[in-house]
A protein has these predicted regions:
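Juxtamembrane/interfacial segments at transmembrane-helix boundaries in multi-pass membrane proteins
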Residues: 21-52
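Juxtamembrane boundary at the C-terminal end of a transmembrane helix
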Residues: 180-190
Length: 190
């Protein structure tokens, strides 16, 4: 079935991810990640609707891309409802461990991207003293813990959607990212 393929979900997610990066680049004035984070720490950022829409779209993309509960249930035993887990059914041992590690690392990258771009507080610079770096690492760990708790609460309070509804779910992310870009073009302050 074509809808169960993880690559199919990734192909739905990619246009939304490109629009999110485009919206962030328009707001920050650059496509460099360090410049985006630097802009987000500046007082000029303020409250912007386009950044809120981009954040919600990126969270939807992260959920779909990592095959979390509304899109896929990692703990299911029904092969017909699996998206990501159907791919790893035939693996065991170290090969399964490597696939699970890759899945965890992808989730870590998305959570780190959301935490460092949208909540850049506590980020230490290279030239600062070791105490500031320790505070930066502590802030990063706290952001990851907060994201983990938020993900756990979200997954326990929402039910898995049908496989045929996944394109609509990802389409919402694309629509929100497009609205973020459109709002940025319409008004410089949004």
């Amino acid at each position: 079935m074509l809808f169960r393929s993880p690559t199919m979900v990734e192909s739905w997610v990619e246009p939304a991810l490109i629009m999110i990066v485009f919206a962030l680049a328009l707001v920050a004035g650059s496509t460099q990640l360090s410049t985006m984070v630097g802009f987000m720490t500046s007082p000029a950022v303020g409250l912007r609707v386009s950044l809120g829409l981009a954040l919600v779209a990126l969270v939807i993309v992260a959920i779909a891309e990592n095959a979390r509960v509304p899109v896929d249930n990692p703990a299911t035993h029904l092969e017909l409802t699996m998206v990501h887990e159907a791919m790893v059914l035939e693996y065991s041992g170290r090969h399964l461990a490597l696939l699970e590690l890759a899945s965890w690392l992808k989730l870590l990258v998305y959570v780190s991207l959301i935490a460092c771009v949208f909540t850049p507080w506590g980020i230490a610079h290279i030239r600062q003293n070791p105490g500031a770096l320790a505070v930066g690492v502590l802030a990063y760990v706290c952001k990851l813990a907060g994201a983990g708790v938020s993900l756990a609460v979200f997954e326990t309070t929402i039910a898995k959607m049908r496989v045929f509804r996944v394109p609509d779910f990802v389409g919402v992310a694309l629509l929100l990212a497009f609205l973020a870009v459109l709002l940025r073009f319409v008004s410089a302050s949004l």
